[in-house]
Amino acid sequence: MRAVTLQDYKRRILHVLTYIQQHLDSSLSLDDLARLACFSPYHFHRVFRGMVGESVKEHVRRLRLERAAGELRRGSTSVIQIALDAGYESHEAFTRSFKAAFGAAPSQFRRIRRAQSATVISGVHFRPGTTLQHFRTVRGGTSMNVEIQRLQPMRVAFLRHVGPYNAVGATWDRLLTIMGKDGYLGGCPMMLGICRDDPEVTPPSKIRYDACVTVDDDFRPNGEIQVQVVEGGEYARTTHAGLYNTLGRTYAEFLGGWLPRSGRELRNAPCFEVYLNDPESTAPEDLLTDIYAPLRPISNEK
């Protein structure tokens, strides 16, 4: 079961990698790629990053730069036209990215026709006219401490933050001030965060994050603070230790390393986080955050 599951995940991601190679000049929206791979849009990007070792955006940008390197080697197309074809709006931005990738500016690269390029974990490079047969996955997640838990639905009061992920503190301050003043924090409720957009993908100004506190059935929305229900069911739980701004690495290992080897798939619902200690009184390196990923049995029919 586990070997089949891992191979299934690899096949689905390989399908996406092949599609990207063949449609490098398309918009390549994450929703479209998620549908192509039969993944929930909530989770596709983290699974992709965890298995491939780079985000979709990073992968596409690198392939376009590799294509640009080939064009510089072969022809006389102007550097600015090659830059525009690679998705850059200026010669300067293209030159910076190209030099970072190949160790030489485009004009220098064209003269010497060779330069260093970074080794990538996946082993996937721009190869026009060839069929992508396999890719190397990131080796991770096998040593993670993960528990499967069945949760009851949780009723939560929440405030929604729209904006940079690192600015959610003000939303939490507002939520806890109101809830504390109204006497709803006395029973040690759980503090949950639901990030409905991936900070590595969504523009900072559009990230939606719900700061949540568990409440009982007697709590009523009061205008500013609303109520929602976090779905019950089976969840995989792992604990992230350390700064909140390093949560992305744990997500990548969890969903791109552990999950494909677990025999499970994710439901079409967001992950959520439970904050186990107070950032106001805890050293950043000692912060503990439980990550819950919603599970469903993996289908045997593909």
Where in this protein do the model-derived segments appear?
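The alpha-helix within a helix-turn-helix
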Residues: A34, A83-L84, T95
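Short hydrophobic/aromatic patch on the recognition helix
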Residues: Y42-F44, F48, A93-F94, F98
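Short, Lys/Arg-enriched, Trp-marked, Pro/Gly-tolerant hinge/linker segments that flank
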Residues: M1-T18, A37, E54-S55, R61
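Basic, amphipathic alpha-helical hairpins
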Residues: H15-L28, F48, A69-S78, F98
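Conserved MFS/SLC helix-loop-helix module at the cytosolic interface between two early adjacent transmembrane helices
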Residues: V47-R49, V56-K57
